[in-house]
Amino acid sequence: MRPAALNTEVSEARRHGGFEDEQVYGLVRHFPTDERYALGDQHRRAVVSIPSNIAEGNGRDSKSDYARFLSIARGSLFEVQTQLGLAERLNYVTVSEGLKESITRISKMLYSIIHKLRT
């Protein structure tokens, strides 16, 4: 059984974990046509993976499984961050500071939950 405080943190992470899907999907529309099906597709898959892995981990029976899925979600978040940086360096898009801050905030939230599950 998970403590209520941890469930609250997870609910918040799930809510914020889907923050960027609409924003990233919108950014991908500005990619050159040939990149929409390469880098753009990779962006979309990574973005969908974040809340999906949070939800799947929440449904697991053990703390270690739960932490593993949250770790996968955090890895996908870093993947999105890296891909957005690349798209920005290639001048495909301009990534807002708000989006960058949201990624950092969610990463910290996930790290905190993972740490609590593992201790």
Protein language model features and the residues they cover:
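Amphipathic alpha-helical assembly/interaction segments
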Residues: 1-119
